[in-house]
From Swiss-Prot:
Residues 25-134, 143-232, 242-350 form the Ig-like C2-type domain. Residues 403-559 form the TIR domain. This is Interleukin-1 receptor accessory protein-like 1. It is a single-pass type I membrane protein. Glycans are attached at residues 63, 122, 138, 213, 264, 331. The gene is Il1rapl1. It comes from Rattus norvegicus (Rat). Belongs to the interleukin-1 receptor family.
């Protein structure tokens, strides 16, 4: 039914008045062009879409029905882009059709992308606007195109609704839509706090792991419509001003610099989440902003984001002063601001005094460290260091040049057949290893009483004279030495005691094994307090016999130093050595040989060989370091004139010199040489018979 004429005139006047209200822009050929509408359509290829003419939804106050009734027609044009040629659209009525104020695509193709212009006009008025359509494909392996996503933000611990956008054209008012939701294009078992309502997904309490892409899927006819929304989770909106991390608000920070150098003042602050507002941080000098200063040498760096999490940021900004001058010194303030307030902190740029505190501290620290290391090394390797220095740079002892021996060795002699299992190692060390190492390896000249002292009636005086001729006194404290009080001779003789008390001779006391609990050990402790120059060295058993052990190094360190080569065995057996008993030893050996020759000459022929072998065997057993054997001429006589014209004496038992045989204790067999027992040539004195020669 046609509308009455007056009504049409009124409608036309109303529509014309509506057009006159809108301001024209981009008018061409009498048609107002509103360019491209703000609403853009983005769909995936194969999905349906409805493009509405935007003129009826924001530009004019009328609808398609009223415009058509007023005699206005709606036409559609397509172009590739703004300013391109527009051509009318020929609708095929199936895939692409015009329905009232819209164009329907069922479905879209990639070539459908472009600008669609809708024009309403009559003979007097014309208005035009373009709508953008973008058709894209899914990203590889995904169910969405990352350039066609919607974006939502949610605050931590708060609720959030995610809507399935732009599906109103596909919903039926009489039916509930069947919408499926995916996260990252995969089905998910949703927790109870996530609820679905028609076309929305409600998260009652947002968590950090809710961040991601949510896709809703709706079926429309034979097509599928998908919309994807990316959810970003942030911290709750802050209600506090930013917090300064450096410099601190509560105190003035002083930064020293040198004139002519560069200075860098860095300000760091923490900003809570404030929405899309960027952090505001800057420097000021007094009441002036840095950019307002006349100096180009003073400038600010860009704001740097050091850390960021859920919208909260830690940022920094630096103030750089190139070539610091006197006028650049002073107070600089760092300000931080957000919608909740402003805070600031100050830094005082101060001239550095010419004090090398750091350098001095570093140097002293290095020296102290070097000193500690040196002391530690010296403590651990003192003996090795001193021996090395002495061997390469040391000098011999001058105060001992007039002494014949390097050391006097005092110990208790025990025959090997009397060694027991407990003290055998100590006795072997004292009798064999110690003298052998000192003489043969280190080349020292020792005075060993059992070997070098000829017994006389003045035995104690002879010992004192020999000790006085030695640079060191070595006392070997074996268990037998302690039990027999081997040191008693040093207490009986006044000269020896004074030498120990006054420090005229340095004493080296070698303790073998554990001596505590042994009889007379208390006297050993008293002896130690008596000696002024005393060094105690522990011998810890056979492991100390090794050449590289600490024991030998310590002993060598305490012994006098002299540059000599280690003596050989032949040198140690040389009877021409000079000393307090050098000549006496020569005579002793010759006299012994003469006595032995006389005894053998008068003995029975069968006993000569036996006595000769037995005598020399016993001598070898009792004397380990020097042999007193002498080859007697076959005639059995000894040219005593070879001794020389010097006055010499010896303490040989006169029975041997007279040719007498010692009395045997056995009475089972008669003595073959009994006839010679009373043939004394020289009378024996009481003093001579009282002296025994076993101390050799």
């Amino acid at each position: 039914m046609k509308a009455p004429i007056p009504h049409l005139i009124l409608l036309y006047a109303t529509f014309t008045q509506s057009l006159k209200v809108v301001t024209k822009r981009g008018s061409a050929d009498g048609c107002t062009d509103w360019s491209v509408d703000i609403k853009k359509y983005q769909v995936l290829v194969g999905e349906p879409v409805r493009i509405k003419c935007a003129l009826f939804y924001g530009y004019i106050r009328t609808n398609y029905t009223l415009a058509q009734s007023a005699g206005l027609s709606l036409m559609w044009y397509k172009s590739s882009g703004p300013g391109d040629f527009e051509e009318p659209i020929a609708f095929d009525g199936s895939r692409m059709s015009k329905e009232e104020d819209s164009i329907w695509f069922r479905p879209t193709l990639l070539q459908d992308s472009g600008l669609y212009a809708c024009v309403i006009r009559n003979s007097t008025y014309c208005m035009k606007v373009s709508i953008s359509l973008t058709v894209g494909e899914n990203d590889t392996g995904l169910c969405y195109n990352s350039k066609m996503k919607y974006f939502e933000k949610a605050e931590l611990s708060k609720s959030k609704e995610i809507s399935c956008r732009d599906i109103e054209d596909f919903l039926l008012p009489t039916r509930e839509p069947e919408i499926l939701w995916y996260k990252e294009c995969r089905t998910k078992t949703w927790r109870p706090s996530i609820v679905f309502k028609r076309d929305t997904l409600l998260i009652k309490e947002v968590k950090e792991d809710d961040i991601g892409n949510y896709t809703c899927e709706l079926k429309y006819g034979g097509f599928v419509v998908r919309r994807t929304t990316e959810l970003t989770v942030t911290a709750p909106l802050t209600d506090k001003p930013p917090k300064l991390l450096y410099p601190m608000e509560s105190k003035l920070t002083i930064q020293e610099t040198q004139l002519g150098g560069s200075a860098n003042l860095t300000c760091r602050a923490f900003f809570g989440y404030s929405g899309d507002v960027s952090p505001l941080i800057y420097w000021m000098k007094g009441e002036k902003f840095i950019e307002d200063l006349d100096e180009n040498r003073v400038w600010e760096s860009d704001i740097r984001i050091l850390k960021e999490h859920l919208g909260e940021q830690e940022v920094s900004i630096s103030l750089i002063v190139d070539s610091v001058e006197e006028g650049d010194l002073g107070n600089y303030s760092c300000y931080v601001e957000n919608g909740n307030g402003r805070r600031h902190a100050s830094v005082l740029l101060h001239k550095r005094e010419l004090m090398y505190t750091v350098e001095l501290a570093g140097g002293l620290g290095a020296i102290l460290l070097l000193l500690v290391c040196s002391v530690t090394i010296y403590k651990c390797y003192k003996i090795e260091i001193m021996l090395f220095y002495r061997n390469h740079f040391g000098a011999e002892e001058l105060d001992g040049d007039n002494k014949d021996y390097d050391a006097y060795l005092s110990y208790t002699k025990v025959d090997p057949d009397q060694w027991n299992q407990e003290t055998g190692e100590e006795e072997r060390f004292a009798l064999e290893i110690l003298p052998d190492m000192l003489e043969k390896h280190y080349g020292y000249k020792l005075f060993i009483p059992d070997r070098d002292l000829i017994p006389t009636g003045t035995y104690i005086e002879d010992v004192a004279r020999c000790v006085d001729q030695s640079k060191r006194l070595i006392i070997v404290m074996t268990p037998n030495y302690v039990v027999r009080r081997g040191w008693s001779i040093f207490e009986l003789e006044t000269r020896l005691r004074n030498m120990l008390v006054t420090g005229e001779i340095k004493v080296i006391l070698i303790e073998c094994s554990e001596l505590r609990g042994i009889m007379n050990y208390q006297e050993v402790e008293a002896l130690k307090h008596t000696i002024k120059l005393l060094t105690v060295i522990k011998w810890h058993g056979p492991k100390c016999n090794k050449l590289n052990s600490k024991f030998w190094k310590r002993l060598q360190y305490e012994m006098p130093f002299k540059r000599i080569e280690p003596i050989t065995h032949e040198q140690a057996l040389d009877v021409s050595e000079q000393g307090p008993f050098g000549e006496l030893q020569t005579v002793s050996a010759i006299s012994m040989a003469a006595a032995t020759s006389t005894a053998l000459a008068t003995a029975h022929p069968d006993l000569r060989s036996t006595f000769h072998n037995t005598y020399h065997s016993q001598m070898r057993q009792k004397h380990y370091y020097r042999s007193y054997e002498y080859d007697v001429p076959p005639t059995g006589t000894l040219p005593l004139t070879s001794i020389g014209n010097q006055h010499t004496y010896c303490n040989i038992p006169m029975t041997l010199i007279n040719g007498q045989r010692p009395q045997t204790k056995s009475s089972r067999e008669p003595n073959p040489d009994e006839a010679h027992t009373n043939s004394a040539i020289l009378p024996l004195l009481a003093r001579e018979t009282s002296i025994s020669s076993v101390i050799w």
